[in-house]
């Protein structure tokens, strides 16, 4: 069972460039938000005639909350390609298609099947993230054949690093397989799926802040019945409901990186997921 919510927390969402000013003949890529920015940064590493820009700030909690502006349209108008997560996460997609029907849009999740709750935050499952990388790479190679070999080499390098990360924690993750946890953030169920954990469903209108008293009561009863001792939340999120449930059940609260925001660093995803694997390996 997976926890599903509608929407995410909101912060500033002004456009930001992750590279130097574009030259007129550069291949221009615009990404929708932070996870796609980091992914594409790795694929375009050391390719001098490619200009990469993120449409949103790296502190935007969810692209659902991005207010699409005329500046965004101008940015996309001048782009050769727009890279998005897909799975209906970028709700403004129809505006892009309507304004620029010939814009090349790469939906990173094209080869990813959303889980049973249609959770689009698939990048916290490394297996699905690798599928995103491979698809974006293949499309960039097709659309920008001049740099085909470089995209391919960067894809291979990045996937090898991710596979190494998987290998480093394979034994630790196998020890927790099948354990049941309570998840209080919509970005974390795909991580649980990757770790082969069972998860408790709890209904909420927005993140974990509007959970009803009845929902909390029922969750506490289920956790006690199944002896669930782990609660997963996102780093920086409101701990109020998690602490209420933890007090009643004796469960421990674990904070994870959503990989939704962070430093604009080529190794950001690798570093965040390594931290997540260390934490998840310690659950009770």
What spans do the regions from the language model cover?
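Sec-dependent N-terminal signal peptides
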Residues: 1-2
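Extracytoplasmic metal-acquisition and chelation regions
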Residues: 8-284
């Amino acid at each position: 069972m997976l926890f599903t919510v509608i929407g995410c927390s909101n912060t500033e969402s002004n456009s930001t460039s992750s590279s130097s000013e574009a030259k007129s003949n550069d291949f221009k890529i615009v990404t929708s938000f932070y996870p796609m920015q980091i992914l594409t940064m790795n694929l375009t590493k050391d390719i001098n005639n490619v200009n990469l820009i993120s449409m949103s700030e790296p502190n935007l909690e969810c692209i659902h909350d991005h207010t699409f502006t005329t500046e965004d349209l101008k940015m996309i108008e001048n782009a050769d390609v727009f890279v998005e997560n897909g799975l209906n996460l970028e709700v403004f997609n129809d505006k892009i298609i309507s304004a620029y029907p010939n814009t090349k849009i790469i939906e990173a999740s094209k080869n990813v099947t959303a889980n049973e709750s249609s959770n689009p935050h698939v990048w916290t499952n490394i297996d699905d993230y690798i599928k995103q990388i491979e698809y974006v790479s293949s499309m960039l190679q097709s659309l920008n054949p001049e740099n085909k070999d470089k995209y391919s080499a960067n894809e291979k390098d990045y996937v090898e690093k991710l596979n190494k990360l998987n290998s480093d924690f394979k034994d630790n993750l196998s020890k927790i397989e099948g354990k049941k946890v309570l998840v209080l953030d919509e970005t974390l169920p795909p991580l649980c799926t990757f770790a082969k954990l069972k998860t408790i469903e709890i209904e909420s209108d927005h993140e974990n802040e509007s959970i009803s008293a009845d929902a909390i009561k029922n969750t506490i009863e289920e956790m006690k019945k199944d002896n669930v001792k782990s609660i997963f939340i996102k780093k920086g999120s409101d701990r109020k409901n998690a602490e209420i449930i933890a007090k009643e059940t004796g469960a421990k609260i674990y904070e994870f990186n959503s990989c939704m925001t962070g430093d604009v660093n080529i190794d950001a995803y690798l570093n965040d997921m390594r931290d997540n694997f260390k934490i998840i390996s310690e659950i009770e």
